[in-house]
C-alpha cells in the first residue's frame, strides 16, 4: 500500500480529535449508547449515499454498478475476516479518506468521497469530513461477518 504521508497524519489527528470530542460529550452526558448509535447512523447513511451503488447495500461488493467496473468492488463485510479476524480500522479510514491507495487497485474507480465531504463541510451543510469518515469506518467495523 502506498500512502500520502503528509495528508494521512492530518486526517488521523482530525479523526482522533473528533473521537475525543464525541467521547467527552458521551462522558459528560452519560449517554454512551445513544452516542454510539448516532455515530453508526451517520456512518450507515454515508455508506448508503456514497458506497452502496458499487459495494451493495449489504457491503458484499455486489452493488448495482459493480459489473460496470474494471475491478470488482471489495466485500466490505469481510474485511476483518480477510485480516486475520481484526478489523483494519486505520487502513480502512485512510482508504476512505483518500490517503492510502491499494496496490493493484485503479484508484480512479473509487471516488475520493472525502473531497466531496470537505466541500459539503465548507458549505456548512454537513458535519466535519473527518467525523463522517470516522463514522463510516465505525459503521463498516460494526457490520463485519
What do the PLM-derived regions correspond to, one by one?
Residues 133-138, 145:
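Thiol-/selenol-based redox modules, centered on thioredoxin-like
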Residues 12-23:
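Bacterial N-terminal signal peptides
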Residues 1-10:
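N-terminal secretory signal peptides that target proteins for export/translocation
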Residues 40-52, 123-127, 131, 144:
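Sequence context surrounding c-type heme c attachment/ligation sites in exported
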Residues 68-128, 136-140:
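Extracytoplasmic electron-transfer domains, predominantly the class I c-type cytochrome c fold
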Residues 26-46, 84:
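Electrostatic cytochrome c docking/interface patches
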Residues 43, 47-57, 110, 136, ...:
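The canonical Cys-X-X-Cys-His
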Residues 60-61:
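Short, non-ligating residues that shape and space the ligands of small metal-coordination modules
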Amino acid at each position: 500500500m502506498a500512502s500520502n504521508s503528509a495528508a494521512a497524519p492530518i486526517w488521523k489527528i482530525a479523526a482522533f480529535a473528533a473521537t475525543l470530542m464525541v467521547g467527552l460529550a458521551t462522558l459528560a452526558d452519560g449517554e454512551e449508547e445513544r452516542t454510539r448509535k448516532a455515530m453508526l447512523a451517520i456512518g450507515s447513511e454515508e455508506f448508503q449515499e456514497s458506497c452502496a451503488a458499487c459495494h451493495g447495500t449489504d457491503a458484499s461488493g455486489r452493488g448495482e454498478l459493480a459489473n460496470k467496473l474494471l475491478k470488482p468492488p471489495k466485500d466490505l463485510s469481510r474485511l476483518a475476516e480477510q485480516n486475520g479476524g481484526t478489523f483494519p480500522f486505520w487502513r480502512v479510514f485512510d482508504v476512505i479518506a483518500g490517503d492510502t491507495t491499494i496496490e493493484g487497485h485503479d484508484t480512479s474507480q473509487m471516488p475520493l468521497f472525502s473531497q466531496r465531504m470537505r466541500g459539503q463541510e465548507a458549505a456548512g451543510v454537513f458535519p466535519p469530513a473527518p467525523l463522517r469518515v470516522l463514522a463510516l469506518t465505525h459503521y463498516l467495523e460494526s457490520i463485519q461477518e
